[in-house]
Amino acid sequence: MERFLKQFWWKIIGIGLLMFAIVSGLWIPLYYGVAGLSFPNLPILNESIRNLLFHVPMWFSMVFLLLLSFIYSISYLGTPDRMRDNYAVGFAQVGVLFGALGIFTGMVWAKSTWGAFWTNDPKLNGAAIGMLIYFAYLILRSSVEDEMKRGKLAASYNIFAFIMYIAFIFVIPRLTDSLHPGNGGNPAFSSYDLDNTLRMFFYPATLGWIALSMWISSIWIRYNFLTQEYEEYED
């Protein structure tokens, strides 16, 4: 992972895909446009459908980062070392950042389509509870001074946190009625709200946001590692 994060090619490709998706996606009209390209002009959604290029890819990026954090926590319990712990917490911290951005863009979208920034919806409530679980993970890490004890305790909690988060945002909402697409019988990514033109920009946007989240994570992980090295050098 460390060798991959230091490589530059995937960062250029990711930023290129992201710029293509966002700039072009914001330019494509909701009616017959240049070269026949247009986004679905649906009732209620209207122009807010462009938020699909932000809200959903941010959540995909969050889940991807939290999955990596989960994997590194398992790896740390098997072979404890500082770098594995740094990867676990670094991916989790940036994952929480993208989760917060996902919630913010979702609230803006909800206000436009549902008439309120927040509703008593199992998907939304599950996302909020999941974020609180990860905030508790970060607080737990800062409350333990011994490095080895902190690493093992945090890794164990992180494994629990990821499993619970997946249950809160993917499993439980599917078992109940929900306004959110993809839950409670409300389909997501159907031909009704995701046509071929929108797919041309949605998939590159998803890959671009994931690449950006990985790039930010690599910088943050490196910063944390250098900070630890500097503090030990001063001591």
Residue ranges of predicted features:
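Polytopic transmembrane helical bundles with strong interfacial aromatic enrichment
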Residues: 1-235
